Every structure is written in C-alpha cells, then in structure tokens.
Amino acid sequence: MSGQTFNPERLMQVILSPQISEKATFIGEKHNQIIFRVAPDATKPEVKAAVELIWKNQKVEVESVRISNVKGKEKRFGRFMGRRGGWKKAYISIKAGQEINFSEISQGEVK
C-alpha cells in the first residue's frame, strides 16, 4: 500500500477542514493527533497522502489514520422532523515531536 501514487488534485480535495472543538483540542494535546473533516469517499491511504502533501514543507510524517462516519442529527422544523447530513472525520496521528502549523500550507506543487 505504501507504493501507491495518488492524483495531487484529488488529494487537495480529500481534507475539507480541521475539526475544532474541546474534545479535538484535548485529543490533540494528549495523543498528538489532529482531527479533520474529510470527503465522504476518502480512504485511509488518501488521507495520509493528503496530509503529507499539504504539509510537506514542515516534513510531517503520519503514523496512523483512523476514520469514523458521523451520523447527522435529527432536528425539528416546526412540527416536522428532519435530519442533518452525516459526515466523515479522520483522526491523524503524527510522529512525536512534530506538529502541524495551519498557517504554512503548501498548494501541492508536484515535480
């Protein structure tokens, strides 16, 4: 699996946004992990390659990726019940001593 090559344009679409919450901050400090919202069809190897491509200037090395599907919540619209859309999130473990700086993102220049 490590020998796979991915389309850089696809990798730039895999990670949608960082998940910023109290729980995400706690996990980040305690376990050296970052939580991202990812595309619904993203796979673990794609997420790993996307993180390493986007933050290649910082030489970030991903140790592991765990992916979870989050169900949408049921919400009431007046007297009708509706459902918000579900989404997928990825827990990215990076090597000890490394951190991701969100202000230094490369645009995925491939040579």
Swiss-Prot record:
Keywords for the protein's UniProt record, in alphabetical order: Ribonucleoprotein, Ribosomal protein, RNA-binding, rRNA-binding
GO molecular function, one term: structural constituent of ribosome
Keyword Ribosomal protein assigned: yes
Gene Ontology BP terms: translation
Gene3D superfamilies: 3.30.70.330
Record GO cellular component, one term: ribonucleoprotein complex
Pfam families noted in UniProt: Ribosomal_L23 (PF00276)
This protein's record includes keyword Ribonucleoprotein: yes
Function: One of the early assembly proteins it binds 23S rRNA. One of the proteins that surrounds the polypeptide exit tunnel on the outside of the ribosome. Forms the main docking site for trigger factor binding to the ribosome.
Family according to the record: Belongs to the universal ribosomal protein uL23 family.
Quaternary data: Part of the 50S ribosomal subunit. Contacts protein L29, and trigger factor when it is bound to the ribosome.
Identification of the protein by name: Large ribosomal subunit protein uL23
Species lineage: Bacteria, Pseudomonadati, Pseudomonadota, Betaproteobacteria, Nitrosomonadales
Encoding gene, per UniProt annotation: rplW
